[in-house]
UniProtKB/Swiss-Prot annotation:
Protein encoded by which gene: Cd14
GO biological process terms on file: cellular response to diacyl bacterial lipopeptide; cellular response to lipopolysaccharide; cellular response to lipoteichoic acid; cellular response to triacyl bacterial lipopeptide; inflammatory response; innate immune response; positive regulation of endocytosis; positive regulation of interleukin-8 production
Free-text note on domains in this protein's UniProt record: The C-terminal leucine-rich repeat (LRR) region is required for responses to smooth LPS.
Organism listed in the record: Mus musculus
Name of the protein: Monocyte differentiation antigen CD14
Matching InterPro entries: Leu-rich_rpt (IPR001611), LRR_dom_sf (IPR032675), Monocyte_diff_Ag_CD14 (IPR016337)
Amino acid sequence: MERVLGLLLLLLVHASPAPPEPCELDEESCSCNFSDPKPDWSSAFNCLGAADVELYGGGRSLEYLLKRVDTEADLGQFTDIIKSLSLKRLTVRAARIPSRILFGALRVLGISGLQELTLENLEVTGTAPPPLLEATGPDLNILNLRNVSWATRDAWLAELQQWLKPGLKVLSIAQAHSLNFSCEQVRVFPALSTLDLSDNPELGERGLISALCPLKFPTLQVLALRNAGMETPSGVCSALAAARVQLQGLDLSHNSLRDAAGAPSCDWPSQLNSLNLSFTGLKQVPKGLPAKLSVLDLSYNRLDRNPSPDELPQVGNLSLKGNPFLDSESHSEKFNSGVVTAGAPSSQAVALSGTLALLLGDRLFV
């Protein structure tokens, strides 16, 4: 029993900046900071009633817990206790975690009602447990990974996927050490609607082709590639065609984009209706954009004149805010062709899923 409770301790925790006590608790959330040289791990039990739990490990290694925790213990007698937890969102930051501890924790969380998991600034070490025929981990809606390194390198996504139930809807991977996935090992993500690969400046268009394993994302609707080393809209289009994904929304903001003169034509996803090209340094409207869009964001670029209608796709909501040719940041104009220019389109203007609003919110249109 002590070993199982020790494993539960690993599940329920993270941090705010160095509070006097390891854990702070309010009605819904609990935050623990274990950066002290001799942390009081037992204080994490204060988080048992919280829905939103955060753990900050202070960069320490949890290798020693392998001798104290049975990651394969029978959880039968604790099932009702785990199910009764209010835990919905869990964040774990700044630690060195053996894969046996991580996947053992996911097995326990599989009994809970956890919906969102965030792992940040982690190093996952060692050999993982044998693969399972059926996932026993949590039924997550959202998984956020930022600066997480894995001992299994390119096989890490396939390995992690074995421990998650197949209902994942939103996956965010930032500052990844490898996005060159072993696609033959990756299973299909049958419910994934939003994939965010932002803040991976080394990814580039070639890397995007490797990351978007063909036929593994059949329900993908929204792809975010902010600050991801993209160079041309046409190059991204080619990567999407190779992956055979049918997007509705694409965010290419905060990349240094250029117009690829003479680039071969590309067939954009037929359902694409929202394209964000803000903060990309564009001096003119790039050629080869989709012929028709509901929303096109060209704000905060280097356009020195108002684009003429024949330079633009057929678009319902066009944002040009923050470009040099404007006298002010707020500008709207109706073209004879029916193009409407708006200073700052709201997220409600995008006819995408609620998942997009959940993950990207106002970041899709800056």
